[in-house]
């Protein structure tokens, strides 16, 4: 029976290799992209005011603003010009208006009046509003790319352009 002794140099080299492998694995795994948290509320389909299909899941993993509005709401009318400007100034953020409680003609007139050059959906039956538990208009959901969101609903005042701009800027910072 022969006894084999490991030299101190070989043991040291093996230790260095083990540490190097651990460091590579640790930093390699730390930099692995994380999956975006799925928001079940985005699992809806709808029709835009121009009649095109829309899939809510297309917003997953992107900064986005959902704006719940009606054409007869005074606060929605007050917010619309700001939304038009803030959306135009933030092309990295997807804006989607979700209109209800009116006929399509009134919705389309509202979009035209305020030059809302972003997607607006016809939610005449209120299904999307119900998914988000929106009790009244106007309301917003601000989505960050990681899937987290903030719901804002103030039935007593329109959101100021400064507040809207700040909330939108935070989605991409």
From Swiss-Prot:
Cellular-component GO terms for this entry: extracellular region
Any single Pfam family the record assigns to this protein: AhpC-TSA
Subcellular location: Secreted
Gene Ontology BP terms: cell redox homeostasis
One GO MF term attached to the UniProt entry: oxidoreductase activity
SUPFAM superfamilies according to UniProt: Thioredoxin-like
Cystines in this chain: 73-76
Gene3D superfamilies reported for this sequence: Glutaredoxin (3.40.30.10)
Domain of life assignment: Bacteria
Record's keyword terms, sorted: Disulfide bond, Redox-active center, Secreted, Signal
Signal peptide extent: 1-38
Keyword Disulfide bond: yes
Main location: secreted
Family matches, as InterPro entries: AhpC/TSA, Thioredoxin-like_sf, Thioredoxin_domain, Thioredoxin_ResA/DsbE_sf
Record's function text: Disulfide oxidoreductase that catalyzes the oxidation of reduced, unfolded secreted proteins to form disulfide bonds. Despite a weak homology to thioredoxin this cannot serve as a substrate for thioredoxin reductase.
PANTHER family linked to this entry: THIOL:DISULFIDE INTERCHANGE PROTEIN DSBE, THIOREDOXIN-LIKE PROTEIN HI_1115
Family designation: Belongs to the thioredoxin family.
Protein name, as recorded: Soluble secreted antigen MPT53
